[in-house]
Amino acid sequence: MLANEVAAAAGEPLPHIMTKTFMDTFVFMGGAGTGISLAGALILFGKTQASRKIGIFSLVPGLFNINEVLLFGLPIVLNPLMLIPFLLTPVLLAAISYVAVAAGLVPGTNVATEWTTPILLNGYLSTGSLSGSALQLANLVVGVLIYAPFVLIANKIKVKQINDAFRSLLRRSCATADSSRRCLDHNDDAGSLARSLITDLEYDY
């Protein structure tokens, strides 16, 4: 990045396209895995209240490239389904951004910015052009489109888990007179659902 800054100050062509600032600005928007795109996909395509809330709660820190809410709240960690777009999105956005800079559509990064600089602002500051921010917006949309089908698949899996838990809970509650206590003691999805229902009832009344 220093070589680019020196070249820009001297009015010479930038020697490097791929720099740390390039990756922070155009690829890792919202943190690793382009988390801001995942947050957008959750807000737009999430079918459960929990997934939409995670998307909303992660949006503000995501603007500053902080994505721990998504990593451990969704979660992405140890989630094979979300690991695919988590790895694929940065690779594709890096390629798109490289081509855009190489073709002269967007200036190269010639000013180092901190990784926590807000999205869109860092696109302008690092390139000295609004086209840098425009490329970020384009990458954001592409990232949302990549994450969208995986979010939809996750929705179906979650809904099926909830439905299965309801059926299991219903069978157990109708089995014997003292089954309600045993339902609460189970450590599976049905037990978790039973405890959630009890908590909601206690909260409401």
PLM regions and their residue ranges:
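Helix-loop-helix junctions within the multi-pass membrane cores of secondary transporters/permeases
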Residues: 2-86, 90
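Serine residues within intrinsically disordered or low-complexity segments
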Residues: 179-180, 192, 196
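Intrinsic disorder/low-complexity segments
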Residues: 190, 197-199, 205
